[in-house]
């Protein structure tokens, strides 16, 4: 579910079409600011919303202020690149504690934690898997199932995968952030959507 940006050696989520083009344009700038792109979606038709989910390069959660910085940087690039005709919205959020696993490095970084995954293409007759993250190798995510067996999931076939919120995950996230985990709820920092109005001459 991840792809390598050859020009900048940045691992991106597996995306296609417009979403891939936008991700490839903004990812290097986000990396320069110390952030990584976790997920990108373009939703809606009349006024599409570009949803950016990001975190820090060390995997720690970002704040509302970080979201604003990312929004400003990405918005400036998209204003020039103009990938979407007409008006569009830009929304930025953190990955959250129970974050999506969209790249090989996510499966490696969160080895030992619980996760759930769903495939586009069935593997041995099943699409849904849950268990302990064991890492990634050769373009596959490895997850140890409840019966002790390991499932090898092709990253490109993963429709969605996410960490399961547990006490251990909360403690690990708090330690990474250098704060107490007391009262942590796994919520995401989110910046209010910004509207990019139609430019003169746009229809």
Swiss-Prot record:
It holds the Pfam family DUF150_C. GO terms for cellular component: cytosol. Required for maturation of 30S ribosomal subunits. Belongs to the RimP family. NCBIfam families: PRK00092.2-5. This is Ribosome maturation factor RimP. Keywords: Cytoplasm, Ribosome biogenesis. It is found in: Cytoplasm. Its main location: cytoplasm. The gene is rimP. Residues 179-203 are annotated as: Disordered. One of its GO terms (biological process) is ribosomal small subunit assembly.
């Amino acid at each position: 579910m991840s792809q390598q940006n050859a020009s900048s050696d940045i691992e991106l989520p597996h995306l296609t079409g417009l979403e891939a083009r936008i991700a490839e344009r903004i990812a290097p700038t986000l990396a320069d600011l110390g952030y990584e792109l976790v997920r990108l979606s373009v939703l809606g038709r009349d006024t599409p919303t570009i949803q950016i989910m990001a975190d820090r390069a060390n995997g720690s959660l970002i704040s509302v202020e970080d979201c604003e910085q990312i929004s400003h940087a990405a918005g400036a690039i998209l204003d020039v690149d103009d990938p979407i005709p007409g008006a569009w919205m830009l929304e930025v959020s953190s990955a959250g504690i129970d974050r999506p696993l969209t790249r090989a490095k996510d499966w490696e970084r969160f080895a030992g934690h619980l996760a759930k995954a769903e495939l586009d293409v069935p593997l041995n007759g099943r699409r849904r898997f849950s268990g302990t993250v064991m890492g990634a190798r050769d373009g596959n995510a490895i997850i140890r199932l409840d019966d002790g067996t390991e499932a090898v999931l092709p990253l490109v076939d993963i429709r969605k995968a996410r960490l399961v919120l547990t006490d251990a995950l909360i403690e690990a996230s708090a330690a990474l952030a250098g704060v107490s985990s007391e009262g942590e709820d796994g919520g995401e920092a989110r910046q209010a959507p910004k509207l990019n109005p139609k430019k003169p001459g746009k229809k």
